[in-house]
Swiss-Prot record:
It comes from Human cytomegalovirus (strain AD169). Residues 1-57, 87-129 are annotated as: Disordered. Residues 87-99 have a biased composition (Low complexity). This is Uncharacterized protein IRL8. Residues 10-20 have a biased composition (Basic and acidic residues).
Length: 129
């Protein structure tokens, strides 16, 4: 019985460390991520960075994402891939002018259903929205 108590204690410690690491600048703690998400942060891109550093063209975004998807090695990657490609502007030659261009499932405005999707995927710290 004593062993079970020790195991639970170490689990709580680990959870505290992980939630602290995922704490954003606004002080909010992101939902606990699945184990496969621990190594899935996009190389060179972070949500706090200036938008001008984000890829502007669909082809670039596809290439960048594929390199990240190969790190995920999970059944969820096709879903994330579709979500990520959805905010394609009607005019490909036009450069994105705001973060709305990168907001998954956006059709000009952010909806409650999109926020639910964001919570469910728990990838807010590496998807740009």
């Amino acid at each position: 019985m004593g062993g079970g108590g020790n195991g639970r204690g170490s689990g709580e410690e680990r959870r505290e460390k992980r939630s602290g690491a995922s704490e954003g600048e606004d002080g909010m703690v992101s939902p606990e991520r699945p184990a496969f998400m621990e190594h899935s942060r996009p190389v060179g891109y972070h949500p706090q960075e200036d938008e001008s550093q984000l890829p502007n063209h669909l082809e670039t975004r596809v290439t960048v994402y594929r390199s990240h998807a190969s790190q995920l090695k999970t059944a969820d990657s096709p879903t994330l891939f579709l979500l990520w490609l959805s905010p394609v502007s009607s005019s490909p030659s036009r450069s994105p002018s705001s973060s709305e261009e990168y907001h998954p499932l956006s059709c000009g405005s952010r909806s409650a259903s999109t926020n639910e999707t964001r919570r469910r995927l728990s990838t807010a710290d590496w998807l740009w929205w």
